[in-house]
């Protein structure tokens, strides 16, 4: 019996899936002119899938927090768990920190998001990834950042990149009008509606990268409607690679945090979107 148990244990070890590799606190901004706050915040964690025969796709993921709060190490954001869950399926995940209001003002946090994406395109090949297959996304304020980087070509231009370098956008319940924190920085009301150069909706056009939008059936006030508006405007502009999913039995928080579970409908939708779009590039 002992010998049988030992053989079973050995067999289970042999067939066990290797765990993802995590590289922490990689600086994505450099130079001698960085402020102390930039040096503190402009770092990312890279979660790599087990070695594969083909270069893998990568998902740059921005957590939420209203552009005022959040950290890649904050337990309530579940960033490490989300990253590991996708990495086990063969998709690398990059989770950057970024500067926050009020220490930072618009467009500094958007520029940080663009810098993190650019770092990924330039460096993921050294880790086994395909730089042509770098996707971007996030939850809530993170979704807003992903949309701004993926919609406004001026954000990537300083890094010698363009929207063609964005393999796709998979965002979760992001703000599509000018973010309320930016409006507050300007002295405007939180629930006023503004769509200017700081709004993803301002940059809608036919030629944007492929887009997947997830939103909740019990989302925060106005957020589901904002995302539905974005979907409608993209389709109206002739953008043919627009897909969406209303994730039921979720609220504004759980729709993002549940992505750490492989069986979650949102997780499945994002994984399928990345695999399909990566195969097409």
Predicted stretch roles:
Residues 17-54:
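N-terminal cap/lid segment of alpha/beta-hydrolase-fold proteins
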Residues 19-21, 25-31, 166-203, 209:
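Mobile cap/lid helix-loop segments that gate and shape the active-site cleft of serine hydrolases
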């Amino acid at each position: 019996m002992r010998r049988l148990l030992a053989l079973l244990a050995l067999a289970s070890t042999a067939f066990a899936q290797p765990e993802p590799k995590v590289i922490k606190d990689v600086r994505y901004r450099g130079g001698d002119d960085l402020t102390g706050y930039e040096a503190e915040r402009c770092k990312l964690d890279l979660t790599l899938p087990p070695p594969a025969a083909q270069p893998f796709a990568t998902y740059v993921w921005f957590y939420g927090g209203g552009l005022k709060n959040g950290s890649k190490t904050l337990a309530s954001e579940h960033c490490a768990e989300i990253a590991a869950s996708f990495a086990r399926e063969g998709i690398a995940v990059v989770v950057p920190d970024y500067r926050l209001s009020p220490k930072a003002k618009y467009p500094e946090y958007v520029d940080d998001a663009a810098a993190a994406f650019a770092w990924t395109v330039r460096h993921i090949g050294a880790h086994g990834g395909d730089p042509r297959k770098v996707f971007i996304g996030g939850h809530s304020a993170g979704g807003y950042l992903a949309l701004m980087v993926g919609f406004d070509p001026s954000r990537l231009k300083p890094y010698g990149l363009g929207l063609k370098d964005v393999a796709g956008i998979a965002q979760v319940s992001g703000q599509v009008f000018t973010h309320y924190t930016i409006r507050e920085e300007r002295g405007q009301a939180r629930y006023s509606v503004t769509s200017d150069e700081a709004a993803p909706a301002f940059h809608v056009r036919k030629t944007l990268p492929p887009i997947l939008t997830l939103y909740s059936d019990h989302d925060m006030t106005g957020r589901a409607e904002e995302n539905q508006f974005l979907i409608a405007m993209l389709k109206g502009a002739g953008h043919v690679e627009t897909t969406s999913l209303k994730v039921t039995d979720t609220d504004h928080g759980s729709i993002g945090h549940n992505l750490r579970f492989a069986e979650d409908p949102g997780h499945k939708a994002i994984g399928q979107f990345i695999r399909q779009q990566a195969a097409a590039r």
